[in-house]
Design a protein with these regions (language model features):
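A short SAM/SAH-binding and catalytic strip from SAM-dependent methyltransferases
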Residues: 116-131
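Conserved class I S-adenosyl-L-methionine
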Residues: 6-53, 66, 157
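A short glycine-rich, Lys/Arg-flanked "PGG" loop and its adjoining helix->strand segment in the class I
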Residues: 133-145
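A short acidic, Gly/Pro-enriched loop at the edge of an enzyme's catalytic core
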Residues: 106-118
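Core SAM-dependent methyltransferase catalytic element
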Residues: 195-210
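Acceptor-substrate binding/catalytic loop of class I
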Residues: 160-176
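Conserved beta-strand signature within the Rossmann-like core of class I S-adenosyl-L-methionine
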Residues: 146-153
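Class I SAM-dependent methyltransferase SAM/SAH-binding core
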Residues: 58, 64-107
Length: 210
């Protein structure tokens, strides 16, 4: 079932993020909207994760839709959802065989337990520390038992703001993100990190619902 945005503050945050990305959607897509331009370890990580999936999947916060198409090309039954209409319009043009929808991750228009997987690849970084637990619970709601989640984020001191090019974002430590996942009903399966010279530390956590 669809759940309404829970608070006025959350809806304001969504509006700010939507506006910020809408203003940079064309540039963002040009610079970061192709899988070939992504780090090869990210490509391998997501492709390996996708091998476990056997049912409907959502790319939660799909942005320009490139990872959605990447998984679609590998036979995954996937839909991309994003808060930013400009991203969705562009994705539908670039990848016409893939379904995309405008939606907030706080209130997905999906039935309980309807998904086998959720990809949240750097799409949770703009959530304030007080907001992230509710969104993780929403992702757990739409996943079936033993459903798969893959989260990508910038690793650092938890809830510390980072200098993001588009709008305010936050670091998370692996320990804290793992605790939040546990609180939301997930069991962590594995963690991978990478550190590129002169760049922010990156982390990915694979988890399943209990």
């Amino acid at each position: 079932m669809h759940r309404p945005c829970p608070t006025y503050t959350c809806c304001v945050t969504d509006a700010l993020v939507r506006h910020a990305y809408a203003a940079h959607a064309a540039e963002y897509t040009r610079v970061l909207g192709a899988v070939d331009d992504m780090h090869q370890l990210d490509r391998r990580r997501i492709e390996r994760w996708s091998g476990q999936l056997s049912g409907p999947v959502v790319d939660a916060g799909c942005g320009p839709g490139h990872w959605t198409d990447f998984l679609h090309q590998r036979g995954v039954e996937i839909t991309g959802v994003d808060l930013v209409p400009e991203f969705i319009e562009n994705a539908r043009i670039r990848f016409p065989d893939v379904p995309y929808q405008v939606s907030s991750l706080r209130a997905l228009d999906l039935a309980d337990g309807s998904l086998h997987g959720v990809l949240a690849w750097y799409s949770l970084i703009h959530l304030a520390p007080t907001e992230l637990p509710q969104v993780l619970s929403e992702l757990a709601r739409v996943l079936r038992p033993q459903g798969h989640l893959l989260v990508g984020f910038f690793e650092g001191e938890s809830a510390e703001p980072l200098d993001h090019a588009i709008t305010k974002a936050y670091y998370w430590s692996i320990d804290q993100m793992s605790r939040l996942l546990d609180d939301a009903g997930f069991d962590v399966l594995d963690v991978e990190t990478r550190q590129d010279h002169g760049k922010r530390p990156h982390a990915g956590i694979a988890a399943i619902t209990r």
